[in-house]
Regions:
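Bacterial N-terminal signal peptides that target proteins for export
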Residues: 1-9
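Bacterial N-terminal signal peptides
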Residues: 8-18
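N-terminal periplasmic/intermembrane-space "pro-region" immediately following the signal or transit peptide
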Residues: 22-127, 263, 287-290, 296-299, ...
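Intrinsically disordered, low-complexity Ser/Thr- and acidic-rich flexible linkers and loops
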Residues: 91, 266-267, 299, 445-451
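Outer membrane beta-barrel
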Residues: 104, 108-258, 278-295, 302-313, ...
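Outer-membrane beta-barrel pore domains
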Residues: 140, 186-188, 210, 307-470
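Active-site-proximal beta-alpha loop/turn segments in soluble metabolic enzymes
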Residues: 256-275
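Interfacial loop-to-helix transition and helix-capping segments at the boundaries
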Residues: 274-279, 334-338
Length: 470
């Protein structure tokens, strides 16, 4: 330590000796020092200015923070927060309850609510069809057109106690008046994988065109032949068998809905009727289908998307009923007998489809004698893009009754469908032309066709429809 001190003193003395003469020659500081001091003062002033700016900005930030802290919780924001908290708590409580009960809910093609053990399930679905129809025929009121909610349906379905016991309840708001009416209400029990029994109110297993949902038709509406010759809904019991290639249904019911020609020849309508109503002694309906190629699921509609496999389906149906014996005095038989049969074939190629059917109804009426009605429907469609499809349909029908002579039905329809999301969201349009007069046995207000007079001009119907199925 002593050596270092001595060394420092020697270095200091040497420096004094070196600079001493210069200080003696000029007592004023050198210009380089003045410049250095000036720059130091400028830097101090700049630093002070920047410090003042920082202090001003900090003051503004503090004022803004104070304003935000005082004003952010306004009445509106407080209400929004309370609602949000309430919704979150309610949702959490619901989820907690469902979890405690083992229940599940959500969306899988349809809205559903189910028990955790799988014993109970409820599905909710709906259909809305909004339509515009324009009609021309050669009568004093030549042109008619307008909008309507053609179908507004709500369906509840699922199973109870076991997946083997299924149910369906469906209602529709009428397009005229808007009243709500029951359409289907049935229970089905699966005895085995192949056999099941159904009882309640349902469509009779007769012709394929009527059995296909209105949401999954090819044209805007079913054919006029179908509107006159289908059996509609009834109340009864049905046994059914289904395997990989065969389906068979046999129904014993109150009666078929008499829509043949619109003349009410048989006069039965068993939809939503009491048990002791005078209708028929008995009514039996049966349908058999053979799946030659493809899968059953692809024949739930008439179309065939471009990625679908080839399918071929053959079908035949029959119906027989005899009216109620009234016991009233008569010189002859007073019960009508009604026999009907139909055959059909459906083919799908993945981007193209075709369907054809032939139907015959025979009514033995005590007043009018034998009545024979025949109908043919042929239709086909092809996809131009994965979502756009064009189609055409031809209809022929003849109504033979001894007391009157009617023109045969000849009808051609062409149109297209655009599938935004399959059948769930679909836009359809078509135009139909009556090649001959459309007379009473075949007119249909639902389909947009009126009764023609004695006219050489064809009746024309233009229809557009937007559909939502969920």
């Amino acid at each position: 330590m002593l050596g270092i001190a001595r060394l420092s003193l020697l270095v200091g003395a040497g420096l004094l000796l070196a600079v001493g003469p210069s200080l003696a020659d000029d007592a004023s500081p050198p210009s380089s020092i003045d410049e250095l001091l000036r720059r130091i003062r400028e830097l101090e002033e700049t630093g002070a200015s920047r410090q003042r700016e920082l202090e001003r900005q900090q003051q503004e930030i503090d004022e803004l923070r104070q304003q935000v802290g005082d004003n952010w919780l306004t009445q509106r924001r407080a209400e929004e927060i309370r609602n949000l908290v309430s919704d979150v708590l309610a949702d959490a409580d619901t989820r907690s309850t469902l979890m405690q009960d083992g229940m599940t809910a959500g969306w899988s093609e349809q809205f559903f609510l189910a028990s955790g053990d799988g014993r109970f399930k409820l599905q909710v679905s709906g259909l809305q069809q909004f339509r515009y129809i324009w009609n021309f025929h050669d009568q004093p009121d030549r042109y008619r057109g307008g909008f309507e909610n053609t179908r507004t349906k709500i369906t509840l379905r699922g199973h109870v106690i076991s997946p083997d016991l299924t149910y369906l309840i469906r209602g529709n708001f009428a397009r005229a008046g808007g009243s709500f009416g029951l359409e289907d209400a049935w229970l089905r029990y699966h005895l085995t994988n192949e056999w099941n029994v159904r009882f309640g109110q349902f469509k009779l297993p007769f012709n394929r065109e009527e059995l296909i949902s209105p949401a999954k038709q090819l044209a805007v509406e079913r054919s006029l032949v179908n509107e006159s010759l289908n059996l509609g809904r009834s109340q009864g019991i049905e046994m059914a068998y289904a395997d990989e290639a065969n389906r068979l249904s046999l129904a014993f019911s109150d009666a078929g809905q008499d829509q043949v020609g619109g003349f009410n020849l048989v006069g039965t309508n068993a939809q939503n009727t009491p048990a002791l109503r005078e209708d028929t002694e008995y009514a039996i309906t049966s349908r058999y289908e053979y799946l030659a190629a493809g899968s059953w699921g692809q024949f739930n509609d008439f179309t065939s998307p471009v990625d679908e496999e080839f399918g071929l389906l053959l079908g035949v149906g029959a119906h027989y009923q005899q009216d109620e014996f009234t016991g009233r005095f008569s010189f002859g038989r007073n019960e009508e007998r009604w026999f009907a049969w139909t055959v059909d074939v459906s083919a799908e190629w993945g981007g193209a489809n075709a369907f054809a059917s032939f139907s015959h109804h025979y009514i033995d009426d005590p007043s009018f004698g034998a009545v024979n009605v025949y109908g043919v429907v042929g239709q086909a469609g092809v996809y131009f893009t994965p979502k756009f499809e064009v189609f055409t349909r031809f209809e022929w029908g003849t109504f033979n009754i001894g007391i009157a002579d009617f023109h045969d039905l000849y009808l051609v329809t062409i149109g297209g469908n655009y599938y935004f999301d399959g059948h769930d969201i679909k836009l359809s349009a078509d135009i139909g032309v009556g090649l001959y007069a459309v007379e009473q046995p075949w007119d249909s207000d639902l389909a947009g066709w009126r009764i023609d007079g004695n006219s050489a001009e064809p009746q024309v119907v233009i229809r557009t429809q937007f559909q939502l199925l969920f």
